[in-house]
């Protein structure tokens, strides 16, 4: 089966993953984000976050991750569930396998 070609593939749905998705979506890169085993990442197990900019009164980890997810969706991120099982970064184009489906990045002339 031929690999699905994507402009931007993000693996993981913690704060970094969702932030990358928001920026990529705003840059019209049509990001595909795989949420993994625990959507929202480890931060969903944190009860109070008091040291993150923009939340002067603090926020729960679950609420913060819900906010980030909604914002990523709002800008057009394609959110999917799956687990990365292999990554071949030894040559270009890279090949990432998620639950038996392979992905490769689009090259600039293919976009």
Question: Whereabouts are the PLM-identified features?
Answer:
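N-terminal Rossmann-like dinucleotide/flavin-binding domain of flavoprotein oxidoreductases
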Residues: 44-103
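Glycine-rich FAD pyrophosphate-binding loop
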Residues: 27-42
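N-terminal Rossmann-fold NAD(P) dinucleotide-binding loop
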Residues: 17
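Beta1/beta-strand and adjacent pyrophosphate-binding region of the FAD-binding site
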Residues: 3-13
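Conserved small/polar residues in nucleotide/adenosyl-binding loops
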Residues: 104-111
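Aromatic pocket-lining residues of Rossmann-like dinucleotide-binding sites
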Residues: 24
């Amino acid at each position: 089966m031929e690999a699905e070609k994507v402009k931007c593939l993000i693996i993981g749905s913690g704060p970094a993953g969702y932030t990358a998705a928001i920026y990529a979506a705003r840059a019209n890169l049509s990001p595909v984000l795989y949420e993994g085993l625990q959507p929202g990442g480890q931060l969903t197990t944190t009860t109070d976050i008091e040291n993150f900019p923009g939340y002067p009164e603090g926020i729960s980890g679950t609420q913060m991750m819900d906010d980030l997810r909604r914002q990523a969706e709002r800008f057009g991120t394609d959110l999917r569930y799956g687990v990365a099982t292999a990554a071949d970064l030894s040559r270009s184009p890279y090949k990432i396998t998620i639950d038996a489906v392979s992905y490769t990045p689009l090259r600039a002339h293919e976009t």
